[in-house]
Amino acid sequence: MTPPRIFIDGEAGTTGLQIRARLEGREDLELLSIDPARRKDPEARRELLNAADIAVLCLHDDVAREAVAMIENPATRVLDASSAHRTAQGWAYGFPELTKQSREEIRAARLVSNPGCYATGAVALLRPLTDAGLLPPDLPLSVQGFSGYSGGGRALVEAHEGRGEHPMAGPFKSYALSLIHKHQPEMARHGGLKHAPLFTPHVGGWRQGMLVQIPLHLGLLGVTAAQLHEALADHYAGERFVRVMPFEHGQPADPILDPQTLNGTNELELFVYAGPNGEHALLVSRLDNLGKGASGAAVQNLDVMLGLEGAGHSYRLAEGG
């Protein structure tokens, strides 16, 4: 049997490079590559987009939309790693663990949108709790994200590593202070919320690794931190890549969180922290923004689309690889 053909449009970018690295050596897939000299040639791209069984788009939003328009072969399926289609009608949301229906929706879909990194951390915490009725969908929420500099793309990586300049380069920067960020609609739609949360992202001087935090006033909700933890643990029970960390005596075992702990993996850890008087809770997710937040999730989604998820691939990559 001929292995499925995969074309990564944008394989020279941060996410594209890591997707390709995670797929290298896979004998059950065939990777199609564009001649580097023709990387910006629309006809060369069109040819490969239509020759692939799955086209993976690692492009800016406008270019991703153009790439979708180039695909005329009805048999070509699309996995879009941009934010162009994450709330678009007709596109499956590529988070297999998010709901009981998610895997089948991804498996059956022709068009799949890979989640954003910050949004992955947020909706992983929110969706099980809104579905369980523990968080009302109209609850005003604040979300904070802390990412390594690779979350800013190739230009920011090069600036941090001495190959260019970028206004976001430095040990720690807050941004999107207009209070508008492209992940907010995704957080609302797939987190089960009626309104976008107030979201403030921050980028630090480490290469990769991310924390996403959501504070809650439990006294206003009429729920306990233990109930929140139980709902998350029940929802993700048995999942290979999403772990709800133990909750004993009102706290996880780890009082200090390093955003880099899961680097190189496709794993996602969820924590519930509780204040001593039971009035407050802090929901936290930890992931590699280039792993479960981007390329690891993309390779997992490829396998779900192709019915290969049960093959046991780890989707791991060495840190910084």
UniProtKB/Swiss-Prot annotation:
The keyword Oxidoreductase applies. It is found in: Cytoplasm. HAMAP family: ArgC_type2. The active site is at C117. SUPFAM superfamilies: Glyceraldehyde-3-phosphate dehydrogenase-like, C-terminal domain (SSF55347), NAD(P)-binding Rossmann-fold domains (SSF51735). InterPro entries: AGPR_AS, AGPR_type-2, NAD(P)-bd_dom_sf, NAGSA_dehydrogenase, Semialdehyde_DH_NAD-bd. Its EC number is 1.2.1.38. GO terms for biological process: L-arginine biosynthetic process. GO terms for molecular function: N-acetyl-gamma-glutamyl-phosphate reductase activity; NAD binding. It catalyses: N-acetyl-L-glutamate 5-semialdehyde + phosphate + NADP(+) = N-acetyl-L-glutamyl 5-phosphate + NADPH + H(+). The gene is argC. This is N-acetyl-gamma-glutamyl-phosphate reductase. Pathway: Amino-acid biosynthesis; L-arginine biosynthesis; N(2)-acetyl-L-ornithine from L-glutamate: step 3/4. It is an enzyme of class 1 (oxidoreductase). GO terms for cellular component: cytoplasm. Catalyzes the NADPH-dependent reduction of N-acetyl-5-glutamyl phosphate to yield N-acetyl-L-glutamate 5-semialdehyde. It comes from Deinococcus geothermalis (strain DSM 11300 / CIP 105573 / AG-3a). Belongs to the NAGSA dehydrogenase family. Type 2 subfamily.
